[in-house]
UniProtKB/Swiss-Prot annotation:
One of the record's GO molecular function terms: protein transmembrane transporter activity
Pfam families documented for this protein: Tim17 (PF02466)
InterPro entries the record matches: Tim23 (IPR005681), Tim23-like (IPR045238)
UniProt main location, coarse: mitochondrion
Membrane topology field: Multi-pass membrane protein
Quaternary data: Component of the TIM23 complex at least composed of timm23, timm17 and timm50. The complex interacts with the timm44 component of the PAM complex.
Keywords: Membrane, Mitochondrion, Mitochondrion inner membrane, Protein transport, Translocation, Transmembrane, Transmembrane helix, Transport
Source species of the chain: Xenopus tropicalis (Western clawed frog)
Membrane-spanning intervals of the chain: 73-93, 125-145, 180-200
Protein name, as recorded: Mitochondrial import inner membrane translocase subunit Tim23
Amino acid sequence: MDTNHPGSAGGRGGLGSIFGGGSPGYSHSDLAGVPLTGMSPLSPYLNVDPRYLVQDNDEFILPTGANKTRGRFELAFFTIGGCCMSGAAFGAVNGLRLGFKETQNMAWSKPKNVQILNMVTRQGALWANTLGSLALLYSAFGVIIEKTRGAEDDLNTIAAGTMTGMLYKSTGGLRGVARGGLAGLALTSAFALYNNWEHIKGSSSRLSL
């Protein structure tokens, strides 16, 4: 049976046109005239060399000129949520410890269970609120400093931590502001030092050589 008969081709074209699947046919002579300049010899089906598609590290889909690192605003949600959950977990453990300590002379009964549960709930909420508030202030200051300076580095971290401590302890007067600022400065400086420890070690080793 000859499948190249015009009638059979017309029948297939008619069915294809009915169901919307019809497509024009191309002969080998038509395809032979298509230019293949610029195509890779490794893959005739791509207009780029597949070797350029192999990446040694992770790549992100970003607009041209965009920064690959997440900014302060993107990290703020993770920071605030993580601090709230960490504070709740720490407060629950601390409340459990305090509850057992305060009820150690009581017999194991329902009032003892209620008192321990109340202590766990109270301490969990207290620590979650405290750490969440600190994270909110730190993130807000970090975003403001980043937008003002137009850069994201360890100086933003230290400045945001110092200002957070100062504002959080502002109700204690000038002495409280100074203590809060020093505490924030110390914590964020230690964090920045930890993040850059490998770089500092590498720089010191190169200088020693």
